Structures are given as C-alpha cells and as structure tokens.
C-alpha cells in the first residue's frame, strides 16, 4: 500500500481527485507538479506540504517561488523539475496524471527508481508501451492502472492464474456526447458541444478524445500493453451508463466484471491501496435506482478515430506514437477553434499515411515518430 506520493499533474482532474483520496486515506505528498496553474498549485502546496512543487512554465514557477517563500516547499521548473519530482527519494508511488506524451520521460524516471506507478497518463503507454513495460520489469516497478476500464480489467483478472484461460478483454465505452449522431450532424460540432460529456467530468483533451472515440482507441492499445493481449483478444462494447467499467470473458464463457458509480476516485484509490481495500471517498453505486444497463456496438464508420486507432493497434511498432502525436496536435487545433470536429480524424489519417512505421522502436524512434506525426498533422 502506498504511503508517500508524488503527483505529476496535480492541478488537473485526476490530480485533484487523487489529492481527495490521499487526504481521505491518510497518505502524504512528496511532490506536486503542474504546467502553469500557479494559484491552484499554491493552494495545494499549502494544504499538503510537499517537499517539492514544480511548474513546467518558468515564469509561473518564479511566481510560485515568491508565493511560497514563507514555506519549506522547494520550487522547480521545466522538464528537469518534473524528472526530479518523479524520482524524489521519499516517495514510494508516483501518480502520472499529466496529459499527453510529455509524461513519458518522467514515467521512465520513476520506473528507474523502482517506484509504484499509478498510471493515468495513457498516452505514455500508447506511444511507448513496450519500452515502459520492459523497464518496469527490469527495475521491479509495479504499474497499476488508474484508467477506470483498465482498473476494472485488473480487478477482473485478479482471480485468474493462467492467462491462457482468458478468451478476451471487453472494454466498455460510454459512446461519448455524440453517440448516435451521423457524420452530417457531427460536421458542425463545436468545442463547447464536444466538452459536454454525459457521465464523466475530465480535462479538455480527454473529453474531446471521448467525443471522437479516440479515447477508446487509446485505451485499446493501453490494454494490449498492460495485459499482454493481441488485438484480436480485445473487444469494445458500447455501454451508455458507465456502470460496468469493463469485463473479462474466460474460455468457459464466464464473464467477470467490475461495477461502480462513475467516480474516478475509486480506481485511483485502488491503484494506491492494492492489494488492500480500504474505505474511501468514492460514491457508492445505488443498484436499485441506477436504471437499466444497455449494450451495443461502436459505429466505426462515423467515429473514424476509433477505426484509425484499431489500425495502429494491429500495425504495432511506432504506429501508436504516430497516432497519438497526430491526435494530440489535432485536438489542440480543434480546442483552439482552428479546425472542425471531423477534421481531427482527417489529420490523424493524414499523419498515419505519411509517417513511416519503425518496428521494434527505441526511445529515439518513438520521439522522432511523435514529432513527425505532429508536423504531418498540421
Ligand atoms: P487535465 O487537463 O485536467 O490535467 C492535466 C494536468 O497536467 C494538469 O495538472 C496540468 O497542469 C498538467 N499539464 C498539462 N500539460 C502539461 C505539460 N506540458 N507539462 C507539464 N504538466 C502539464 O487532464 P486529466 O486529469 O483529465 O487527464 C490526465 C491524464 O489522465 C490524461 O492522460 C488522461 O487521458 C488520463 N485520464 C483521465 C481521466 C479523467 O477522468 N480525467 C480518466 C482516465 C484517464 P495545469 O493545470 O497547469 O495546466
Ligand atoms: Mg477510461
């Protein structure tokens, strides 16, 4: 069970919910990091008293240093600071809750210190899953999933001793805010429309990914890496209610699932307390009033991002890094009002067609694929 924790991305949706869990479970904080949210970071640092607070942005870090001058909190900036927070000796666990590929180097730094990784930053696994898992094995670092679907799979696999008995993993997908819409209807969807998720309140990037269904595609690749499963042994089912968080189907056709209210504090907490369970702040599920549970198939023709991600999953090598880099660039453009909703998939397809895939990539190949994909997408 975790006792002292570093959070990379503490001011975001996962970061703040992680602090709720840490406070409720009596754990302590070694380091906090964010990009530029000075005020929120100051508040968090005063409340949780970490040794180290890091802001990626230099100017924001200088401001934070002045604001925290009356405390013992050391303030750093940039990637150097992020790496120091990830490897800080007093922490046994690092929660990776930054958004995007920027999380890769700090995740590797934490792994090399043998820390438990509570992994929310799925982009890291999509880009460099094989590398990250090999390093985790070499350094004896545990990786525990924070993503609700992967936590559900993890919990549904806990009783299983022989992976050969697993027929397939089934990821549930809410369908997002645009479920049931046609391509014509999606044409004019704006930033505001995309940011209205029916079941979860999350950061802007992942909320857009949930609207395009790219999020489920990223999760598909994340599951392949975390559970060593080939793409043909993973399926996606639309489940609008987000009550069943994912399932494992075994060779005898038994299905084991994990259910819960849609509340990220539960999977965050389990990544910290595993193999124990303790009472925590997550909302209980009221089975008697949650209504019927429904299931359906995803529409891969309307939601092209999901089809592109499945293609990248089957291709392997740097295809995941290309998919992800192009998507990060395209989503940033969509959020800035520069491209339309359907153009996100166009940009990703464009990058996948243009950037060559490297088999068995090292870190340099992955970083190169990411940069080339971002350029090709713009
Ligand atoms: P948010 O956008 O809410 O938060 C992101 C955090 O990362 C903030 O602390 C932000 O700081 C920091 N950050 C952003 N960009 C950078 C950067 N370039 N360098 C350093 N720090 C940066 O995201 P979420 O919490 O929603 O998501 C975080 C990760 O967790 C993502 O990978 C997402 O896919 C995954 N995830 C999220 C879920 C959710 O429910 N939110 C569910 C499952 C997975 P600042 O505040 O200063 O911008
Ligand atoms: Mg998820």
Language model regions located:
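Catalytic, metal-anchored helix/loop core of enzyme active sites in primary metabolism
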Residues: 1-378
């Amino acid at each position: 069970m975790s006792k002292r924790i570093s959070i990379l991305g503490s001011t975001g949706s996962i970061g703040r919910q992680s602090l709720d869990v840490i406070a409720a479970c009596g754990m302590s904080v070694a380091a906090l990091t964010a990009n530029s949210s000075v005020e929120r970071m100051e508040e968090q640092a005063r409340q949780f008293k970490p040794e180290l607070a890091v802001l990626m942005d230099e100017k924001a870090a200088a401001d934070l240093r002045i604001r925290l001058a009356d405390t013992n909190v050391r303030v750093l900036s940039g990637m150097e600071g992020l790496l120091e927070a990830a490897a800080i000796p007093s922490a046994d666990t690092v929660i990776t809750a930054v958004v995007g590929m920027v999380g890769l180097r700090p995740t590797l730094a934490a792994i090399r210190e043998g820390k438990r990784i509570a992994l929310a930053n799925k982009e890291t696994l999509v880009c460099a899953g094989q590398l990250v898992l090999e390093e985790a094995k070499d350094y004896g670092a545990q990786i525990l999933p924070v993503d609700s679907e992967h936590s559900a799979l993890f919990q549904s696999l806990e009783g299983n001793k022989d992976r050969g008995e697993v027929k397939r993993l089934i990821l549930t997908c809410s369908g997002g805010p645009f479920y049931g819409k046609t391509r014509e209807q999606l044409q004019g969807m704006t930033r505001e429309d995309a940011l209205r998720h029916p079941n979860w309140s999350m950061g802007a990037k992942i909320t857009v990914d949930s609207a395009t269904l790219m999020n489920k595609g990223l999760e598909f690749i994340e599951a392949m890496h975390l559970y060593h499963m080939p793409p043909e042994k993973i399926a996606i089912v639309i489940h609008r209610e987000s009550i069943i968080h994912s399932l494992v189907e075994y060779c005898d056709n038994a299905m084991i699932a994990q259910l819960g209210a849609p509340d990220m504090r539960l999977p965050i907490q389990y990544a910290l307390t595993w193999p124990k369970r303790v009472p925590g702040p997550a909302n209980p599920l009221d089975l008697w009033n949650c209504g019927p549970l429904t299931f359906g198939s995803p529409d891969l023709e309307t939601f092209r991002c999901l089809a592109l991600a499945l293609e990248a999953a089957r291709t392997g090598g740097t295809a995941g890094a290309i998919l992800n880099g192009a998507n990060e660039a395209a989503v940033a453009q969509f959020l800035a009002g520069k491209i339309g909703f359907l153009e996100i998939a166009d940009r990703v397809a464009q990058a996948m067609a243009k950037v060559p895939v490297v088999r068995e990539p090292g870190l340099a190949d992955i970083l190169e694929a990411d940069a080339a994909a971002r350029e090709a997408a713009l």
